[in-house]
Amino acid sequence: MNEDQFPKAYDPKSSETGVYSFWERSGMFVANASSEKPAYSIVMPPPNVTGILHMGHALVNTLQDTLIRYKRMQGFEVCWVPGTDHAGIATQTVVERHLKASLGKRRTDFSREEFLKHVWDWKEKSQNVILSQLRQLGCSCDWSRQRFTMDPGANRAVKKAFKILFDKGVIYRGYYLVNWDPILQTALADDEVEYEERDGWLYYIRYQVVNSEEFITVATTRPETLLGDTAIAVSPEDQRYSHLIGAKVVVPFVNREIPIIGDFSVDASFGTGAVKITPAHDKDDYKTGMNHQLPMINILTPTGEINENGGIFTGLSREVARENIITSLEALGLFVKKEAYSSRVGVSYRSGAIIEPYLSKQWFVSVDSFRDSLREFVNSEEIRIFPPEFVRNYLTWVNNLKDWCISRQLWWGHRIPVWHNKHDENVICFDGEGGPEEVMRDPESWYQDPDVLDTWFSSGLWPLTCFGWPDEDSLDLKKFYPTAVLVTGHDILFFWVTRMVLMCSAMVDTEPFSDVFLHGLIFGKSYREYDEKGEWFYVSGERKRDYDKGKALPKNVVAKWEKLSKSKGNVIDPIEMIEAYGADAVRLTLCSCANRGEQIDLDYRLFEEYKNFINKLWNGARFIFGHISELTSRDLEEGVNQDLLGLEDFYILDRFNELLDLIDGHYNCYSFDKIASLAYDFFKNDLCSTYLEIIKPTLFGKQGSDQQRATKRKLLATLLINILGVLHPIVPYITETLFQKLKATLGTVENGKGDSVTGHAVSMLRSEACMVAEYPKPIHVAFPQGLRESFGIAERLVYTIRNIRGEMQLDPREPLQAFVISSEKKELVDVCIPIMCALGGVKTVEQLAEAPKDSIFSLGVVEGIQVGVILPPEHLAKERVRLEKEKTRLEKSIDSVSKLLASEDFRTRANPSLVQAKKDSLRNSQRELQSILDKLASL
């Protein structure tokens, strides 16, 4: 074969760019909203424009592209909309850091417009990198429909949705205790707060009762908030304090008199049984304050410092104020003690700041009216969640859903479309261009709300905005909405998935997608090295890479699977992996890992393994090309003579049909790991290691007729075309490269359609590309009765020969002489002999009536068929040992099955077919044992 036509080694770098350009140039990614084909649509979870793609993006987009390519080949009008997310808090934070590092300036050194220009510039650069990386990965998105969560269409949709909910009274504004990030200086939704168990202190503080010598002691983890105390609460059933209910105490430093109240929410066993109530800085206290109509005093600034309500502590940070207050309380004799105490602390998922419960006026979405529909979509399976164990998580979250704080104190994001009157409480919600008429007439009297919307508000509308909503006449909206499936990580089930269901159903009264597949989160292997003192640090650099590749770990180094993190040194860059191993190997690795669990352990060695498979695919195809180079498409159009098909041919066709059936089922439930494993095993084991090895003697003219050789070649071409189609959704680059080589080799398809064996392959060759070819279908032939059983016997005969070779320590390169004894299955043995020769490394196999008396041989039995391998004289002792081991195994098996069959309970209760199977098994084992005993006697 010409090296230029088909190089010995596959080079991903030299082919991937050209192949992708061919697809894109040919318009194969573009969806047609006017098509009569059934629609299949996906909207890409938009990557944040904060930087570049990470391995999680590579995973989710590989899985989506696999589905899109599969459905495209199945004849659907597929539409995969790519896009990026403005990611309000995250992007603003990144840009602020960038400006600080590059210009030495803070956000507040710019006007709002100037700062936003910097953010838009950042967005353009980041987005261009992200989209380029998606192309490298092989994503077959419809780039003509590319969206951004702050593009004009998205902005129009956001304003429309806000006004719809505002007019219904679902969106409201009010004072509420929000999760405040003092670093980012914005409110966060409840599910944007992560909770950590942290060690701290429980402080005991005394308050003096007014007009009394008595004191009441409380226990608190936050003594600095006493500046905002508006009550002391005790349980009405606590006899220690019942006489004090209704009395007042003095708050130290601010000299405010506050009541002692009775409230059943107080746990009398906690601390002293008395608790301070600070409604403006604690969620439980806020509820108590509302129930008792207590004043709410905010003591903090947006940056987390004590405000003017803090008296002498004004201007101090929370931490410094705490220390100073404790010192001052000690001086006043009001500090009792402190005890070690562990508590859950809320932390910002973005900045890492300790969250401050903060009384603030914010915009909210009332969720009460949505709770029933959110449950019903999933309970009725209008939306199916995979894996199904996440249904419980979803429903639990919906049942505990709280009003959603949607306003953020940022500059980057969708401005809230509300204008406030400077002179009264009037507000106008406006979703058009420009501003409301009233504002246009008297701009000096109005101002637009300075806050922006939570990123998840616009992301919640993503499936709608991608297809043109609120334009209800949009062809895309009519054709492609709702979408088929949402593929995303289980960690944003609540952040995003549920909010999409809420927002989209609120706008158009239908679910945004039919299925949700939640993949696991990627974990990488990190290595902790311990020193003599027991302190440890993360291993990085070359040493880490050596460990990743399998180098033995020293005793003081411990490996651990952890979430990907730069600080842990376990981040895996998908683009680096593509450069090193090729996009197909990366995609196959990710699909093979995409299990339905919560954690994906991504081992570096997997990339190497699947790169080897890509090379195996190339080499296997190259071998096949060497034997079909004289074929033309016309030969395939003529079909094959099924009378010339052998057991091995029927076997591989049956295995292929079984592969299609299994893969289809796994696609339906998003078992990507099983799809990858099945396709991998079929090509590597069934096609290459088994079928190709069996037919090599025929291909090389060592056995069989010219007609049989021609049939094998047609079948090889047919199988290669079809398996390329099966593999294409997962490994598109190499399959497209090989498909184009097949088209060039076999030539233009004429008018013939082929037969039931070659027909679909002929149909695929008519396609411009593998990507748009029809997905393979089962190959129909008259399969012989008992095919699987017959080939199974052939495989077991081969296994027996290989086992004898191994146990006798015979040279694996030495061709063996074998014989078979079977009075009842001579025809089956005749069919099996070529397979035994090809796969068992046997030179000749003779059918005999009895074992040769003048030879030393090793004997095995399969289904009553005795198979023997002639041995050199020096192997006599080894054969005796082997037979004794086999005799022991069979005796144990016979004893076990005999006891089972002797049980009347088993015979009467078990399925009759199972009882018969056990009887047959016993009979075969007894027959095999007798053969072993005869052989031992002869030795």
From Swiss-Prot:
InterPro entries in the cross-refs: aa-tRNA-synth_I_CS, aa-tRNA-synth_Ia, Anticodon_Ia_Val, M/V/L/I-tRNA-synth_anticd-bd, Rossmann-like_a/b/a_fold, tRNA-bd_arm, tRNAsynth_Ia_anticodon-bd, Val-tRNA_synth_C_sf
Keywords, alphabetical: Aminoacyl-tRNA synthetase, ATP-binding, Coiled coil, Cytoplasm, Ligase, Nucleotide-binding, Protein biosynthesis
One term of GO molecular function: ATP binding
Reaction(s) this enzyme catalyzes, per UniProt: tRNA(Val) + L-valine + ATP = L-valyl-tRNA(Val) + AMP + diphosphate
Residue ranges the record marks as coiled coil: 874-939
Binding site for ATP: 566
Protein name per the record: Valine--tRNA ligase
Gene: valS
